[in-house]
Amino acid sequence: MHVMGSQQENNNPGRVSEQESSCIREDNLSTLETELLHPFSQKIDQFSAREIVELMNQVDADVIQAVGDQVDEIAAAIEVIKDRFHQGGRLIYVGAGTSGRLGVLDAAECPPTFSTAPEMVRAVIAGGSQALVQAVEGVEDRPEQGAFDLGQLAISQTDVVVGIASSGRTPYCIGAIKKARDCGAYTIGLVCNRST
Protein backbone atom coordinates (compact mmCIF):
# COMPACT_ATOMS: atom_id res chain seq x y z
CA MET A 1 0.00 0.00 0.00
CA HIS A 2 1.23 3.46 -0.85
CA VAL A 3 -0.31 6.80 0.04
CA MET A 4 0.68 9.94 -1.84
CA GLY A 5 -0.74 13.41 -1.34
CA SER A 6 -0.53 16.45 -3.57
CA GLN A 7 -1.59 20.07 -3.64
CA GLN A 8 -0.12 21.19 -6.92
CA GLU A 9 -0.69 24.17 -9.10
CA ASN A 10 -1.91 23.12 -12.49
CA ASN A 11 0.10 24.99 -15.10
CA ASN A 12 -1.61 23.16 -17.97
CA PRO A 13 -5.35 22.88 -17.24
CA GLY A 14 -7.01 20.21 -19.33
CA ARG A 15 -3.72 18.47 -20.08
CA VAL A 16 -2.63 15.13 -18.67
CA SER A 17 0.92 15.25 -17.29
CA GLU A 18 3.69 12.97 -18.56
CA GLN A 19 3.58 11.03 -15.28
CA GLU A 20 -0.20 10.60 -15.51
CA SER A 21 0.05 9.64 -19.17
CA SER A 22 2.57 6.90 -18.44
CA CYS A 23 0.17 5.51 -15.85
CA ILE A 24 -2.59 5.16 -18.44
CA ARG A 25 -0.62 3.10 -20.97
CA GLU A 26 -2.02 -0.41 -21.35
CA ASP A 27 1.42 -2.01 -21.65
CA ASN A 28 2.07 -1.27 -17.98
CA LEU A 29 -0.57 -3.75 -16.83
CA SER A 30 1.39 -6.93 -17.49
CA THR A 31 4.25 -5.79 -15.25
CA LEU A 32 2.25 -4.55 -12.27
CA GLU A 33 2.45 -6.65 -9.12
CA THR A 34 -1.29 -6.29 -8.47
CA GLU A 35 -2.11 -7.77 -11.88
CA LEU A 36 -0.01 -10.93 -11.42
CA LEU A 37 -0.88 -14.19 -9.70
CA HIS A 38 0.41 -14.28 -6.15
CA PRO A 39 3.20 -16.87 -6.02
CA PHE A 40 1.73 -18.50 -2.89
CA SER A 41 -1.70 -19.04 -4.41
CA GLN A 42 -0.89 -20.44 -7.86
CA LYS A 43 -2.15 -23.90 -6.86
CA ILE A 44 -4.84 -22.76 -4.43
CA ASP A 45 -7.41 -24.95 -6.21
CA GLN A 46 -5.47 -27.98 -4.97
CA PHE A 47 -5.34 -26.85 -1.32
CA SER A 48 -7.53 -28.12 1.51
CA ALA A 49 -9.88 -25.66 3.20
CA ARG A 50 -7.49 -25.42 6.14
CA GLU A 51 -4.51 -24.75 3.86
CA ILE A 52 -6.46 -21.99 2.13
CA VAL A 53 -7.32 -20.35 5.46
CA GLU A 54 -3.70 -20.61 6.64
CA LEU A 55 -2.45 -19.14 3.35
CA MET A 56 -4.91 -16.25 3.49
CA ASN A 57 -3.92 -15.53 7.08
CA GLN A 58 -0.23 -15.58 6.15
CA VAL A 59 -0.74 -13.23 3.19
CA ASP A 60 -3.02 -10.93 5.23
CA ALA A 61 -0.11 -10.44 7.64
CA ASP A 62 1.62 -8.60 4.78
CA VAL A 63 -1.05 -5.90 5.09
CA ILE A 64 0.19 -5.01 8.57
CA GLN A 65 3.71 -4.51 7.22
CA ALA A 66 2.45 -2.50 4.23
CA VAL A 67 0.51 -0.13 6.50
CA GLY A 68 3.50 0.06 8.85
CA ASP A 69 5.71 1.13 5.95
CA GLN A 70 3.35 4.05 5.23
CA VAL A 71 2.65 5.37 8.75
CA ASP A 72 4.14 8.82 8.07
CA GLU A 73 2.24 9.23 4.80
CA ILE A 74 -1.04 8.03 6.32
CA ALA A 75 -0.67 10.35 9.32
CA ALA A 76 0.09 13.30 7.02
CA ALA A 77 -3.01 12.51 4.95
CA ILE A 78 -5.16 12.37 8.09
CA GLU A 79 -3.85 15.78 9.20
CA VAL A 80 -4.75 17.32 5.83
CA ILE A 81 -8.22 15.75 5.91
CA LYS A 82 -8.78 17.00 9.47
CA ASP A 83 -7.71 20.53 8.49
CA ARG A 84 -10.01 20.51 5.45
CA PHE A 85 -12.92 19.29 7.58
CA HIS A 86 -12.33 22.26 9.91
CA GLN A 87 -12.58 24.52 6.83
CA GLY A 88 -15.93 22.96 5.88
CA GLY A 89 -14.43 20.69 3.24
CA ARG A 90 -15.32 17.14 2.36
CA LEU A 91 -13.52 13.83 1.92
CA ILE A 92 -14.41 12.28 -1.44
CA TYR A 93 -13.31 8.81 -2.52
CA VAL A 94 -13.08 7.90 -6.21
CA GLY A 95 -12.58 4.40 -7.56
CA ALA A 96 -13.60 1.72 -10.03
CA GLY A 97 -14.60 -1.87 -9.34
CA THR A 98 -13.63 -3.20 -5.92
CA SER A 99 -11.63 -0.04 -5.17
CA GLY A 100 -14.72 2.07 -5.79
CA ARG A 101 -16.89 -0.24 -3.70
CA LEU A 102 -14.47 0.12 -0.77
CA GLY A 103 -14.71 3.91 -1.07
CA VAL A 104 -18.51 3.73 -1.08
CA LEU A 105 -18.44 1.38 1.91
CA ASP A 106 -16.25 3.73 3.95
CA ALA A 107 -18.34 6.77 3.00
CA ALA A 108 -21.53 4.93 4.00
CA GLU A 109 -20.01 3.79 7.29
CA CYS A 110 -18.80 7.24 8.45
CA PRO A 111 -22.20 8.69 9.47
CA PRO A 112 -23.24 5.82 11.79
CA THR A 113 -19.72 5.18 13.12
CA PHE A 114 -18.36 8.73 13.48
CA SER A 115 -21.58 10.79 13.45
CA THR A 116 -20.50 12.68 10.33
CA ALA A 117 -23.07 14.44 8.19
CA PRO A 118 -23.82 12.32 5.10
CA GLU A 119 -22.39 14.98 2.77
CA MET A 120 -19.07 15.18 4.69
CA VAL A 121 -17.67 11.91 3.32
CA ARG A 122 -18.76 10.99 -0.20
CA ALA A 123 -17.79 8.45 -2.83
CA VAL A 124 -17.87 8.29 -6.60
CA ILE A 125 -17.70 4.89 -8.30
CA ALA A 126 -17.21 4.20 -11.99
CA GLY A 127 -20.52 2.99 -13.37
CA GLY A 128 -22.60 4.62 -10.63
CA SER A 129 -24.78 2.78 -8.13
CA GLN A 130 -25.30 -0.16 -10.50
CA ALA A 131 -21.57 -0.93 -10.11
CA LEU A 132 -22.13 -1.70 -6.43
CA VAL A 133 -23.90 -4.96 -7.26
CA GLN A 134 -22.81 -5.73 -10.81
CA ALA A 135 -19.61 -5.05 -12.74
CA VAL A 136 -19.97 -2.22 -15.25
CA GLU A 137 -17.22 -2.98 -17.74
CA GLY A 138 -15.29 -0.36 -19.67
CA VAL A 139 -16.10 2.71 -17.56
CA GLU A 140 -12.85 2.37 -15.61
CA ASP A 141 -10.92 3.04 -18.84
CA ARG A 142 -12.48 6.47 -19.42
CA PRO A 143 -10.65 9.34 -17.67
CA GLU A 144 -13.18 11.85 -19.02
CA GLN A 145 -15.98 9.96 -17.23
CA GLY A 146 -14.07 10.14 -13.94
CA ALA A 147 -13.64 13.89 -14.39
CA PHE A 148 -17.33 14.32 -15.28
CA ASP A 149 -18.61 12.21 -12.38
CA LEU A 150 -16.43 14.02 -9.84
CA GLY A 151 -17.43 17.37 -11.33
CA GLN A 152 -21.05 16.64 -10.38
CA LEU A 153 -20.04 17.18 -6.73
CA ALA A 154 -18.90 20.81 -7.21
CA ILE A 155 -15.37 20.21 -5.90
CA SER A 156 -13.71 23.12 -4.08
CA GLN A 157 -10.32 24.02 -2.62
CA THR A 158 -11.40 22.84 0.81
CA ASP A 159 -12.10 19.28 -0.37
CA VAL A 160 -9.81 16.24 -0.29
CA VAL A 161 -10.20 13.72 -3.11
CA VAL A 162 -8.76 10.23 -2.61
CA GLY A 163 -8.25 8.15 -5.74
CA ILE A 164 -8.28 4.46 -4.84
CA ALA A 165 -6.73 2.22 -7.48
CA SER A 166 -4.94 -0.98 -6.60
CA SER A 167 -2.96 -0.79 -9.84
CA GLY A 168 -2.32 2.94 -9.46
CA ARG A 169 -3.13 3.50 -13.15
CA THR A 170 -6.91 3.30 -13.51
CA PRO A 171 -7.83 5.96 -16.11
CA TYR A 172 -11.19 6.74 -14.44
CA CYS A 173 -9.37 7.65 -11.21
CA ILE A 174 -6.66 9.58 -13.01
CA GLY A 175 -9.31 11.67 -14.77
CA ALA A 176 -11.08 12.35 -11.47
CA ILE A 177 -7.84 13.29 -9.69
CA LYS A 178 -6.93 15.64 -12.52
CA LYS A 179 -10.36 17.29 -12.25
CA ALA A 180 -9.90 17.63 -8.47
CA ARG A 181 -6.52 19.31 -8.98
CA ASP A 182 -8.03 21.67 -11.57
CA CYS A 183 -10.57 22.67 -8.89
CA GLY A 184 -7.81 23.23 -6.30
CA ALA A 185 -8.68 20.25 -4.09
CA TYR A 186 -5.99 18.35 -2.22
CA THR A 187 -5.52 14.94 -3.83
CA ILE A 188 -4.37 11.64 -2.37
CA GLY A 189 -3.57 8.42 -4.22
CA LEU A 190 -4.13 5.12 -2.44
CA VAL A 191 -2.40 2.44 -4.52
CA CYS A 192 -0.75 -0.96 -4.10
CA ASN A 193 2.06 -0.80 -6.67
CA ARG A 194 5.28 0.95 -5.72
CA SER A 195 5.99 2.13 -9.27
CA THR A 196 2.67 3.92 -9.82
Residue ranges and their predicted role:
Residues 85-86, 181:
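Anion (oxyanion) recognition and catalysis
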Residues 92-196:
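Glycine-rich phosphate-binding loops that contact phosphosugars or nucleotide phosphates
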Residues 44-48, 73, 138-145:
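Short secondary-structure boundary/capping elements
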Residues 5, 14, 18-66, 70:
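Cofactor-/ligand-binding subdomain signature composed of acidic, glycine-rich
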Residues 89:
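Glycine-centered, small-residue-biased loops immediately flanking beta-strands
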Residues 69-84:
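A short, well-structured juxtamembrane/interface segment
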Residues 65-72, 134-138:
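Short, surface-exposed alpha-helical recognition segments that flank or form part
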Residues 10-12:
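Intrinsic-disorder-associated, low-complexity terminal segments enriched in Asp/Asn/His/Tyr and depleted
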